[in-house]
Structure formats: C-alpha cells, structure tokens
Amino acid sequence: MVYIIKKMVKGEIYYYLNHSVRLDGKVKTLSHYLGKGPFTQYEIESLLKEKSQMILLEAEFLKIFSRKLNYKEHLLPLSFINILERLKEINRIMAPFNKSYFEKFEDNLRLRYVHGSTAIEGNTLSLRDAQLILEEDTPAGNTLREMYEILNYKELFKFMRSYTGDINLKLILKIHETLMKNIDDENAGALRNIDISISGTDYDPTPSPVIEDEINSLIDWYKGKKHFTPPVELACAFHQKFVEIHPFIDGNGRVSRELLNFILIKNNYPRLVIPFERRGVYLRCIDIGNTGDLIPFIIFISGLLIEDSFKPVATFFEQLKSKIIDENYSSEISLELDNTINDYKEILDIIKGMEGRIEKLNLSELRKGKWK
C-alpha cells in the first residue's frame, strides 16, 4: 500500500511517500521525499496519484534484484538464466510506462510469428500479405491453403487470449483443429492413426497406437517439471519431445511452436519469433535434439529472445535510467540495471558469434568470462 506521511521538524511540515515491500522474508519501507508543506488535501491527493507509480516501480526492481533462483533442474548456467529472468521482469514492468509502444510491438511480434511459423513449413506469402490477411481479412496468396494457414492464426489468437488453463490433450487438439481448419478438415484436431517417417532425418516418430499415451506422458512430465525448471528450458524441451512424437499427420511444427510460446507467455515471457531466415539453424537444432542434446536449441531460442523479443528493454533503457535518477532511487538499483544491460549486450554478442557454427553451440563457449 502506498501512503503519505508527514513529519514535523522544528515547526516545519515535510511530506514523504511511503510503501512497504517484503524482501527475503523481511519488510523494507521505501520512502520518497515529496516536499515541504503545508499541502492542501487536493495537493496531497495529486502527489499520491502522480508519484505512486514510481515508488511501486522501485519496489518491483528491488524484488527482481533480490530474487534468488531456486530451479532444481537446469542445463544452462544459473547466471545466464538469471539474466533472462531479469530481462523478462524488466520488460514486464516497463510496459505500463510505454503502453502504446508495447502494444504495437506485441502486434508486430504476433504478425512476424505467424509469418515465420508458416514460412518455415513452406508458405510463400510475404510479411505484407500476412498482415493484410490478419488485419484486414484481405485475400492474398497463390493458393487458398496459404491464405488459410495465415487466417487460422487469427481465430487461434482469439481463443488463446481467453484460455486460462494449462497444457492438456484437449488444448493440443484444439490448437491443431484451429490451425488446420479449411486445410485438412478430415484430420484437423485428430491424432494420426498411421505410422509416418520424416524425410531428411533418421528419426522415426512414435508409432500411431501409442501416440495418445505418449502425449499424456509428455503432459505429465511437463506438470512435474514446470515448477523446477527454467521456463525457456522447459519450453524448448517440451517442443523437442512433442516434435519427436509427431502426433499429427500434418501441422506438427506449427502446433509445437504454439505450445513453446504458450509456456513462455504463461511465465510472463514475450512471444518468440523464429523467422524464416533462421529456419536452417532451427531445424538443425531439432536434429541435434533428437540425439538427446538440447543445449544448442536452448541457446538458439535464448538468443532469439534476447535479440528480438527483449528489444524494448534496450530501446527504453536510457529513459528508464533517467526516471530512476529523477526519483532518487537507491544507487543499488541503478547499479544493478547497468549490470543487467551490460550482461544483455555481452550475451547477445556471444550468441551471435556462436549461431553461425551451430554444431559448436555448447556450454564451454557460453561459459566464457562470468557465465559459469
């Protein structure tokens, strides 16, 4: 709760804005000096309205920077995971201060996500074509299939915005049914009942008689891991396992990427875009994942988040620092913010340098310097 107190010092009235926050099991009271009074009731209410957001923001920062990760199972160094978590939280709490920008940025992420996810599967529509279909229902493309591959996401987004549950078989079938509408109505929302092979790989997907059991086992695995595993690693592992099962005749890639994003968004991460230009790296990471090595895929996905989805953090960092200086936040917050943005830039440089050599994406390179 944010409240105003006044102190009397040598006959003069001084006003302070206070807010209590719990950190590491202890209560810390934040106090911002408002000025020398007396103030009228109207002035007090105006100050409370004007300044409350910033003291609440300070409390959020203190929570972020005091948080200790307690993931029991992780593949990447905790120091690396900590930066992802910090960027996620900073991205989240910055949104109300730049509402219009964030809304447009999220719309752009959704558009590029749809274009990338369908292009990976062979859709030839341009980004502009996809935009016309999603935003204006304007027909575009060489075939009806290509148009519906894009248009179906509009219905899917509407459903997912209202969905409050977690991953289950019903949700997976609903996602597939929606994405395959008017494309393959006979098999939309139905698990495959035939065995298949995947061209270009040595991997054999799950035999059809045990697909439902394998999907249910995957869901149970997810439920057992979701509180103990970093969200990015959890999302990548779920995606990999789902692709290996390959439960549908067609549409497995699109469903797997939607489920990956569902896990990220449910954990307050922004949407992830895998652009068509990264298709080769993405598919190679999945191939490596088939051998049991998930690290290249996790580093690849982390790199996309840092490079693209967390772009608002870099865009508004200086503005945020200016607000903090103006409000006389503690030097600890300013220092931690500087450390975080420097780590962000350092990780981005490391990952960009590694991606061109996908076969060598490994922890020994990621652990350069402090990433241990």
Predicted regions and their residues:
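FIC/Doc superfamily catalytic core
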Residues: 1-250, 254-372
